[in-house]
Amino acid sequence: MSAQPVDIQIFGRSLRVNCPPDQRDALNQAADDLNQRLQDLKVRTRVTNTEQLVFIAALNISYELTQEKAKTRDYAASMEQRIRMLQQTIEQALLDQGRTTEKTGQNFE
């Protein structure tokens, strides 16, 4: 799908960006989130300079993204470790079953 121009409002300023039609809702949601963050920052920090507010918001969003990436990386590493442990457990159980079958002469097929 080709991107189409979309007009959005960010903190009272109009921006035209290209966006695929199927991602327009996500873009609007992101714009709403950014507007809310900027408004919250303006109230909390009493900073009135829009450029400063945008930079602070960008830093906050970047920090949050970095934290989420770290969580995802840690979760993936944890899952890989669990999978390795499960594989070892299964392999050991199969080896034990093979030894038991050899000793008793029974076949479980």
UniProtKB/Swiss-Prot annotation:
Q: Mind listing the UniProt keywords for this protein, alphabetically?
A: Cell cycle, Cell division, Coiled coil, Cytoplasm, Septation
Q: Which InterPro entries match?
A: Cell_div_ZapA-like (IPR007838), Cell_div_ZapA-like_sf (IPR036192), Cell_div_ZapA_eubact (IPR023771), Cell_div_ZapA_N (IPR042233)
Q: Which GO terms describe its cellular component?
A: cell division site; cell septum; cytosol; plasma membrane
Q: Which residues form a coiled coil?
A: 21-97
For this protein, the record's Gene3D superfamilies field holds: 1.20.5.50, Cell division protein ZapA protomer, N-terminal domain (3.30.160.880)
Q: Which GO terms describe its biological process?
A: division septum assembly; FtsZ-dependent cytokinesis; septin ring assembly
Q: Where does it live in the cell?
A: Cytoplasm
Q: Which SUPFAM superfamilies match?
A: Cell division protein ZapA-like (SSF102829)
Primary role: Activator of cell division through the inhibition of FtsZ GTPase activity, therefore promoting FtsZ assembly into bundles of protofilaments necessary for the formation of the division Z ring. It is recruited early at mid-cell but it is not essential for cell division.
Q: Which PANTHER family match?
A: CELL DIVISION PROTEIN ZAPA
- HAMAP family in the cross-refs: ZapA_type1
What family is this protein classified in? Belongs to the ZapA family. Type 1 subfamily.
Assembly and partners are described as: Homodimer. Interacts with FtsZ.
Q: What is this protein called?
A: Cell division protein ZapA
Traced from the root, the source organism's taxonomic lineage reads: Bacteria, Pseudomonadati, Pseudomonadota, Gammaproteobacteria, Enterobacterales
